[in-house]
Amino acid sequence: MARPHGTRVLGERHIRTGLAGSALAKGDLVQSTEATGTETINNAATNVAVAGFTLEAISSAATGDYDRMRSGDQFWVYVTTGTMQASEVGKFCDINNELGVTLTESNNDARIMGWDGVTTNFAIVEFTTPESATPTVLA
């Protein structure tokens, strides 16, 4: 059975603190921007470099912790659109919103690394810098 969205599968935790640009729930997929020494985190959107997953609910304009991703880190994520199956492993997927991914290959936001073989709405993914032609890199 799949673990909750945002559960780390591979790689060490890298806890960072950021200022929430909007209200965030625990486990939200976030992107990051830095300006004048302040790191601001917001819900992730497709075609951006993903910063990590929130470790707690964070009110808008408040600071909170998130698990920062690094190259090679893998996480369980919720598949919001599409049906996870063995043929999807090794393919790319796109961020749908802060709560999950869609099994399309338009922006190539993450690579599907595995699944539990049963649960069709969860996958193990490795987030990478988007491989689309014109990525907007915010992290």
Question: Language-model segments: which ranges?
Answer:
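Surface-exposed, low-hydrophobicity beta-strand/loop segments enriched in small/polar/acidic residues
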Residues: M1-A139
